[in-house]
Amino acid sequence: MPELRSRTVTHGRNMAGARALMRASGVPGADIGRKPIIAVANSFTEFVPGHTHLQPVGRIVSEAITAAGGIAREFNTIAVDDGIAMGHGGMLYSLPSRDLIADSVEYMVEAHCADALICISNCDKITPGMLMAALRLNIPTVFVSGGPMESGRATLVDGTVRTLDLVDAISDAVNDKISDEDILRIEENACPTCGSCSGMFTANSMNCLTEAIGLSLPGNGSVLATHTARKGLYEDAARTVVDITRRYYEQDDESVLPRNIATHAAFENAMALDIAMGGSTNTILHLLAAAQEAGVPFGLDEINEVSRRVPCLAKVAPNVAKDRTYYMEDVHRAGGIPALLGELHRAGLLNEDVHSVHSPSLSDWLKTWDVRAGSPSPEAIELWHAAPGCVRSSEAFSQSERWEALDEDAEGGCIRSAEHAYSKDGGLAVLKGNLAVDGCVVKTAGVDESIWTFEGPAVVCESQDEAVDKILRKEITHGDVVVIRYEGPKGGPGMQEMLYPTSFLKGRGLGKTCALITDGRFSGGTSGLSIGHASPEAASGGTIALVQDGDRIRIDIPNRTIDLLVDEAELSRRDQALNGVYAPVNRERKVSAALRAYAAMATSADKGAVRDVSKLG
């Protein structure tokens, strides 16, 4: 039977000082050494709408842990708002913050000998950073996120009512046909509430994937941040972490440990969900990183195999269905992630040998929570009726609206069955070829099928800023392939997101007639023929460093290939001319010591852009 980890600091005369400090921090003396210490990793910050409401959430979770028989000790991590950091030097810090968050959780848990962990995450790098930490620590852990934002609604000058999200505010801002007054109305209404941005962007994608992996409760990825139903989710998560902590330490039940939940089969299921729902390409980066922390051999080849057999069952903003745009509130109304998993299960596309923090098996999980399975629990039906309040609010639990009816239409609704899939090809794909020997990724759910095969001349940019300038100066034309290089994990450093270039292409009317390729990455809000994570990156001598203006590039999504149409002899000549120096030309960029440290250890995107400490020698 494993001893409580906290016994190290709660037992023995020589730990009198540690116990004195615990008493000073509010722990009742009678509880010290008798109850498990549950670390509450909160990520509250006033910088990020996805986290601005989390301060009271930490208290709710801590109080529920106390009531369930644990000792809750809350601390905070940092949280970068990618939307605010976007388009300037601040974005260099976003991806490196993932590893910093993972380290900070590890530091706090190990320094204080916590017995278990509950992670209150939400936005882009916070959930994956905490996931990496949980798998690294391998102590009983439950995830519970802050929840999605409601979609926006703006009444324009001409009386037209538009549904909106953050990406609309960015792309419309460069559309000369939209008036300043309408831009202001769009800006004021695109992000109406607290929560992670309303589409299937990176934050919501990752929170949904924690459900599929088995480390969070049903509804974690889809119950709106503003809804009162989310309070019950926080309390249930708190009770669950105390329960699995007891099962491990009192019953020697190792099945509750993160590495025994997040198995290879669980990662495959999560990737199947990701592809079916057309999640952010960033999720691939983060799942690769998490798998390494879990010791699970899971790479781009496995992801490519899954992508070839799983269809696209949901198109959620920024991906657009033919008749309408769906948001996370629509996914929730359709039964949330259990409904998507249920459709995949009925199509024979999920591994059965998985379990979760809340259910002993996949079949038990879906029987209880899938509203389309025929016998969902009353609690499930109640949960999926939680609807948007359509009132501006930055407060959690500020509304309790309910849908009159659920969307159970598997033929034409938000979530489709495999038989009625949006496309037989899934929403994400891995491409390989001489331009990306180790692979690159594209969100096919966001690409118009008319350009799934594409060939055009390269327009080379040594930075995201150069690409933005060329787009805004109208130097990019229909048929071009914009190549942005030296923006990878090492070359950036920090692997910036490219939401502005893709949004500006869309705003200029080039979203369906141009391609963009980069060794950087894209926001979850990106759509169009946007191919990222080209590996090896330019700074590591990848072929993308050899591309010249006018070179023809061919993209073939159905056949999963991407090629620079330049013969090998010429590429060899160009490589020799660089003389081993792979660096951007005429780019001035301030790089801090913190970023240089990240770059010194960073791996390419095909390895998850994780740090490789062996590079330190």
UniProtKB/Swiss-Prot annotation:
UniProt-listed InterPro entries: Dihydro-acid_dehy_C, DihydroxyA_deHydtase, DiOHA_6PGluconate_deHydtase_CS, ILV_EDD_C, ILV_EDD_N, IlvD/EDD_N
Binding sites annotated in the UniProt record for Mg(2+): 82, 124-125, 497
Cofactor binding comment, as recorded: Binds 1 [2Fe-2S] cluster per subunit. This cluster acts as a Lewis acid cofactor.
Gene Ontology biological process terms from the UniProt entry: isoleucine biosynthetic process; L-valine biosynthetic process
An MF annotation (GO) of this entry: 2 iron, 2 sulfur cluster binding
A family per Pfam: ILV_EDD_C
Modified residues (N6-carboxylysine): 125
Residues passing through the membrane, by range: none
Residues where [2Fe-2S] cluster binds: 123, 197
Obligatory cofactor(s): [2Fe-2S] cluster; Mg(2+)
Active site: 523 (proton acceptor)
Keywords, sorted A to Z: 2Fe-2S, Amino-acid biosynthesis, Branched-chain amino acid biosynthesis, Iron, Iron-sulfur, Lyase, Magnesium, Metal-binding
Cellular-component GO terms for this entry: cytosol
Pathway: Amino-acid biosynthesis; L-isoleucine biosynthesis; L-isoleucine from 2-oxobutanoate: step 3/4; Amino-acid biosynthesis; L-valine biosynthesis; L-valine from pyruvate: step 3/4
EC number(s) stated in the UniProt entry for this protein: 4.2.1.9
Catalytic activity from the UniProt record: (2R)-2,3-dihydroxy-3-methylbutanoate = 3-methyl-2-oxobutanoate + H2O; (2R,3R)-2,3-dihydroxy-3-methylpentanoate = (S)-3-methyl-2-oxopentanoate + H2O
Xref: Gene3D superfamilies: IlvD/EDD C-terminal domain-like
Family: Belongs to the IlvD/Edd family.
Biological function: Functions in the biosynthesis of branched-chain amino acids. Catalyzes the dehydration of (2R,3R)-2,3-dihydroxy-3-methylpentanoate (2,3-dihydroxy-3-methylvalerate) into 2-oxo-3-methylpentanoate (2-oxo-3-methylvalerate) and of (2R)-2,3-dihydroxy-3-methylbutanoate (2,3-dihydroxyisovalerate) into 2-oxo-3-methylbutanoate (2-oxoisovalerate), the penultimate precursor to L-isoleucine and L-valine, respectively.
Subunit structure: Homodimer.
Full protein name: Dihydroxy-acid dehydratase
